[in-house]
Regions:
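Acetyl-CoA-dependent GNAT
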Residues: 8-12, 18-84, 90-93, 99-104, ...
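Conserved active-site alpha-helix within GNAT-family acetyltransferase domains
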Residues: 90, 116-133
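Conserved GNAT acetyl-CoA-binding A-motif
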Residues: 102-112
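Conserved beta-strand-loop-alpha-helix junction that forms the acyl-donor binding cleft
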Residues: 111-121, 137-142
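Terminal substrate-recognition subdomain of acyl/acetyltransferases
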Residues: 144-163
Length: 163
């Protein structure tokens, strides 16, 4: 079995990230940014990009907002894989969580998921995220405000799950 590799993303990866964001159905679940927005995020010092590779082929990405913030809270802003349903997203998520907790002082990682996105929610729960509540109208997608289920994982729970 080939292993997945999580690597730090760079400006050279923007084309792949944008292509993945534009896969059918992803705009409604993941969102998408322009090239200028991605370049600005990469340059602002607040965001960290990660690419997941399988046999030297890019198959997914994640964007973390507030990487190494002084508040010690990181947000998984966006995460996606090119071919869902193969378990790669869950592996990407688990590796990303490990990376955040081992490379930063983060105490809490949180994310928002649309309540109807059962596949993503199951993956988040499998890695240890817990639902905290509904953030009403917190996401503006396709000209509509949408609710998001806030899920989070705190360092003590992550540490306990590793033992």
């Amino acid at each position: 079995m080939k292993t997945l590799q999580l690597v730090q993303g760079t400006a050279d990866d923007i084309a792949f990230v944008m292509a993945a964001e534009r896969l059918p159905g992803y705009e409604e679940l993941v969102g998408r940014w322009s090239e200028a927005q991605h370049r600005a995020a990469l340059a602002d010092g607040r965001h960290a990009y990660f690419i997941v590779r399988l046999a030297s082929r890019d198959i997914g990405f994640a964007i973390v907002r507030d990487w190494a913030s002084s508040e010690r809270v990181a947000c998984i802003k966006r995460i996606a894989v090119s071919n869902p349903g193969q378990g790669h997203g869950k592996i990407l998520l688990a590796d990303l969580v490990d990376r955040i907790f081992t490379k930063t002082d983060a105490y809490r990682i949180w994310l928002g998921v649309f309540p109807e996105n059962d596949r993503a929610r199951r993956a988040y729960e499998a890695v240890g995220f817990k639902a905290e509540g509904l953030a009403r109208g917190s996401a503006f997608f396709g000209g509509v405000y949408r609710d998001e289920l806030v899920m989070a994982l705190v360092r003590p729970d992550w540490s306990a799950g590793r033992n």
